[in-house]
């Protein structure tokens, strides 16, 4: 079968036979992955980046380790393992930390300053069904409480016959933290975050936000101004004739004076990098996609929330725009906002979050710091999740005999630093990079 796949993800493009890069309706580059995906400067001009394996290879070469170009992670792992073995690398005992041997299921870990701060959202034994009536939920609950342990999974499981979107979820969000929510499609993430400001009110269990009980209709209405939710593709929330009117909609609904509404509109647009004077009178649908998304963000920020809930805010963005929005969210967090972010990108969660909660079949599967969660690649794989690209390569290198800590969270930069120390500190054997007949030719950017 012939396959043509469109993607923003370079690791996916690396698996193709050929790659065509488009810009403004024209083919900007075309060739094999090895010919295209290592051209860092040209890709950057097209708002794209290199695969993590190429970034790691380039970082190692800059540190004096002459590894060959590899666009696929498995090939880069094999290349580094070859260099390590060639240098006479001896096995080094790396002691695992306590978290290495600890299963993550429903675990709870303390995380930096946020662990000591006050709770802003407290979820206790929350369950939700989109299909069961109150009477049916009580009947189901009675069955589940009388069932033995072996049958409870069948009663509560997220199989096609299960009516439960959330199952007995207990969770605390603390002031000032950046909490990530991960999980496969259908795991309950979006249902959970819609409970955080009362868009969905609790059926069973409780949700308290900023001291207000969201089972109360009055309290749920009051908390909406303080817990802002930005949905996936938030630009689809835009509706007004001008940018200023759209951003002003929420504050006006609060009954604020017009001078305060105007202040909030200008302030929130500035926080997302937009100028009220330049675009305030424009129709939001005349703006670029990235600007539309920023306007939608501004509309939520104009409510001056204490908690910002983001449901896959980078969905559909190219790598450059993705980086811009991650920078924006990080800046808002550093300004004091508590952030809860749903994402399918393990790299984004690893780079941004203080703590990660993993959902599976409507329940909390794991909870911990990024390092604690991503140290358990096999457990995550069992529920259809991966780990960040640098972490994948570090774990694969450890399995290949390169002495790396499996309980440490690696970025590409940190992994390159540690590998350079290992590879350059091995026995005094000259480093060489074989370009053997039949091997993939080095590219112009990477070289051998």
Describe each PLM feature range.
Residues 182-184:
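The feature captures the beta-strand-to-loop junction immediately N-terminal to the Walker
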Residues 197:
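Helix-to-loop junction immediately C-terminal to a conserved catalytic motif
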Residues 308-311:
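Catalytic Walker B motif of ABC-type/P-loop ATPase nucleotide-binding domains
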Residues 283-287, 291:
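Conserved ABC ATPase signature
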Residues 304:
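Conserved catalytic motifs of ABC-family nucleotide-binding domains
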Residues 205-213, 223:
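Conserved ABC transporter NBD signature motif
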């Amino acid at each position: 079968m012939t396959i043509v796949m469109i993607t923003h993800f370079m690791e996916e493009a690396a698996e193709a036979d050929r790659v065509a890069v488009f810009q403004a309706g024209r083919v900007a580059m075309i060739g094999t992955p090895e010919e295209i995906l290592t051209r860092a400067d040209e890709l950057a001009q097209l708002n794209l980046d290199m695969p993590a394996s190429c970034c790691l290879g380039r970082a190692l070469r800059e540190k004096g380790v002459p590894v060959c170009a590899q666009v696929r992670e498995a090939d880069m792992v094999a290349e580094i393992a070859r260099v390590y073995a060639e240098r006479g690398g001896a096995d080094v005992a790396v002691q695992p930390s306590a978290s290495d041997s600890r299963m993550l299921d429903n675990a709870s870990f303390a995380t930096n300053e946020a662990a000591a701060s006050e709770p802003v959202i407290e979820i206790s034994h929350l369950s939700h069904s989109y299909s069961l009536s109150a009477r049916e939920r009580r009947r189901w609950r009675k069955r589940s409480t009388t069932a033995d342990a072996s049958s409870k999974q069948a009663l509560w499981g997220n199989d096609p016959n299960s009516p439960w979107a959330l199952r007995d979820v207990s969770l605390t969000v603390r002031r000032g933290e950046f909490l990530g929510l991960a999980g496969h499609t259908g795991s309950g993430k979006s249902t959970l975050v819609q409970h955080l400001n009362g868009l969905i009110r609790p059926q069973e269990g409780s949700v308290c936000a900023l001291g207000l009980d969201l089972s109360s209709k009055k309290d749920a209405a009051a908390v909406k101004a303080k817990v802002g939710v930005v949905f996936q593709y938030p630009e689809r929330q835009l509706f007004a004739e001008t940018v200023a009117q759209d951003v002003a909609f929420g504050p006006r609904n609060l009954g604020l004076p017009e001078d305060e509404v105007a202040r909030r509109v200008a302030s929130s647009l500035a926080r997302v990098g937009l100028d009220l004077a330049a675009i305030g009178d424009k129709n939001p649908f005349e703006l670029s996609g990235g600007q539309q998304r920023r306007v939608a963000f501004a509309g939520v920020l104009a409510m001056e929330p204490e908690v910002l809930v983001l449901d896959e805010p980078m969905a559909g963005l190219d790598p450059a725009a993705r980086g811009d929005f991650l920078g924006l969210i990080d800046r808002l967090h550093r300004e004091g906002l508590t952030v809860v972010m749903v994402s399918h990108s393990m790299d984004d969660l690893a780079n941004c979050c203080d703590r990660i909660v993993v959902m599976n079949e409507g329940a909390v599967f794991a909870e911990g710091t990024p390092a604690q969660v991503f140290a358990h690649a096999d457990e995550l794989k069992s529920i259809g999740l991966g780990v960040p690209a640098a972490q994948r390569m570090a774990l694969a290198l450890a399995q290949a005999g390169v002495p790396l800590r499996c309980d440490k969270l690696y970025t590409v930069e940190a992994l390159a630093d540690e590998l350079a120390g290992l590879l350059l500190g091995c026995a005094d054997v000259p480093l060489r990079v074989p370009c053997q007949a039949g091997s993939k030719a080095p590219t112009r950017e990477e070289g051998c």
